[in-house]
């Protein structure tokens, strides 16, 4: 059987396959990169929450007072800006004086190149490019009889 035309059917199939792959690789790579970036940010948020819990427990042991106000990235020994993401951590104070903080707040601000990731997170508050994650502060005092209610400190 004589071949007619410039391209054989097999060569046409290969060209079609290569062109489809070249069209799909770029979006798939971009999607994979976004998933990887979101995973790194989630890991960083969980690490900051864990470090904040440990810092609070250590601060209570050192100061013997449940009321703690000082929490920041510098106190935790973490870098605030990493790969286009700015992190901030603080305590969420309840309105009652001389009581422990009610939660840990981790704020994540994404720069312009990372704004496409905002919908990939389940943040408690989303304001523009800033995501806020709340985590309850888990700390139990073994013996509440030794707590001075007037000062919020352990006797």
Regions found by a protein language model. Give the residues of each.
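N-terminal single-pass transmembrane signal-anchor helix
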Residues: 1-37, 41
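Hydrophobic beta-strand residues in large extracellular and virion-surface proteins
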Residues: 48, 52, 87-91, 104-108
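Cysteine-centric signal of extracytoplasmic or virion-exposed proteins
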Residues: 64-70, 97-100, 149-154
């Amino acid at each position: 059987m004589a071949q007619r035309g410039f391209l054989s059917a097999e060569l046409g199939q290969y060209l079609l396959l290569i062109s489809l792959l070249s069209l799909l690789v770029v979006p798939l790579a971009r999607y994979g990169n976004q998933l990887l970036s979101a995973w790194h940010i989630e890991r960083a948020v969980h690490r900051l929450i864990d470090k904040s819990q440990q810092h609070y427990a250590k601060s209570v042991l050192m100061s013997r007072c449940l009321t703690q106000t000082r929490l920041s990235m510098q106190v935790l020994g973490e870098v605030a800006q990493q790969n286009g993401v700015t992190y901030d951590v603080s305590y969420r104070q309840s309105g009652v004086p001389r009581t422990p903080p009610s939660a840990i707040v981790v704020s994540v601000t994404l720069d312009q190149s990372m704004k496409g990731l905002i919908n990939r997170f389940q943040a408690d508050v989303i304001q523009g490019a800033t995501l806020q994650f709340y985590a309850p502060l888990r700390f139990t005092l073994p013996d509440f009889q030794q707590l001075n209610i007037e000062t919020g400190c352990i006797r």
